[in-house]
Amino acid sequence: MFFRVRFLLFFLLFRNLCCLLTSGCLLRVYGVGFSLGFFICMQIICGVCLAWLFFSCFICTNWYFVLFLWDFDLGFVIRSTHICFTSLLFFLLYVHIFKCIVLIILFDTHILVWAVGFIIYIFIVVIGFIGYVLPCTMMSYWGLTVFSNILATVPVIGTWLCYWIWGSEYINDFTLLKLHVLHVLLPFVLILVIFMHLFCLHYFMSSDGFCDRFAFYCERLCFCMWFYLRDMFLAFLILFYVVYFIFINWYFVFHEESWVIVDTLKTSDKILPEWFFLFLFGFLKAVPDKFTGLLLMVILLFSLFLFILNCILWFVYCRSSLLWFTYSLILFYSIFMSGFLALYVILAYPIWMELQFWVLLLFMLVVCRLD
């Protein structure tokens, strides 16, 4: 039985990684997904190296960690790489999502592929937030305090969930230890979900390019050599640019309050998370009530998910009128993406609360109308 299971796993890996036949006219933007997987693997390797040096001390975690890294060979380089790769991963992730939204205009994507990709996005957001909290600086401490207090507003289980995360009646060393364990374990679960995403993508052939969608013939190529070389070239080209931020301008991704020692008796002058959390943080800031902000954030995430599913199903049943469908969908996507970017910028900056609320309400109505 063990040999059969091992043979089956080896066959699936060999079929999906080496012997996959795909269209020869795949666009170069498909390499963004390969770059995402490449940098996620490098991020996990750097994280495992840093996990050995983590010191679970609520007050002095950041400074002890920095001192350990200075004594450790290439320790600070590994930490700078880990931090810079976080911003890079979220940038590539948003580019990948935008690419998928645009290409759905031309190609139908299987529902299961998009559903697993949505789960990957939720995993990356959770892992990124836990990693943001672990250094326990002034900004991360109050970010964890605000978010855990928001979870406490969930009916019935909110208070129990908040105390379970804290491990006490307040944030302490045990809280950091719990979050550290989750931050180490969740990336390996993420790898399994990514393999599931790849398997569904290759099984349903959702990204087959122009070959099966239009009338002309296109030769199929083996994915093993040509596309791997092309995707690796793109990944190393991105890595070449990131090296500048790792070795020269590594403080570019840091806030100034990322070096402030935590003080539980003094709140931060401003609570401004990393740029990839600004969109989600805007919902919590735009609504005065904590539970309403959390509810709106969850509703919007699932509204975006249902919006794409609606477009996929619409494509399946409207293939006969492809030209009319393409024009109308381009119009919808232009309205949607412009509203998304405007909401991202407006909610990120400290402007009037009333303006943030009305912009949020308008965007929610647009998304619900498109659904």
UniProtKB/Swiss-Prot annotation:
One of its GO terms (biological process) is mitochondrial electron transport, ubiquinol to cytochrome c. Keywords: Electron transport, Heme, Iron, Membrane, Metal-binding, Mitochondrion, Mitochondrion inner membrane, Respiratory chain, Transmembrane, Transmembrane helix, Transport, Ubiquinone. Signal peptide: none annotated. SUPFAM superfamilies: a domain/subunit of cytochrome bc1 complex (Ubiquinol-cytochrome c reductase), Transmembrane di-heme cytochromes. Its cofactor is heme b. The chain crosses the membrane at residues 32-52, 76-98, 113-133, 179-199, 227-247, 296-316, 329-349, 350-370. Heme b b566 binds at H96, H197. It is found in: Mitochondrion inner membrane. A ubiquinone binds at H202. One of its GO terms (cellular component) is mitochondrial inner membrane. Heme 1 (or BL or b562) is low-potential and absorbs at about 562 nm, and heme 2 (or BH or b566) is high-potential and absorbs at about 566 nm. This is Cytochrome b. The lineage of its organism: Eukaryota, Discoba, Euglenozoa, Kinetoplastea, Metakinetoplastina. The gene is MT-CYB.
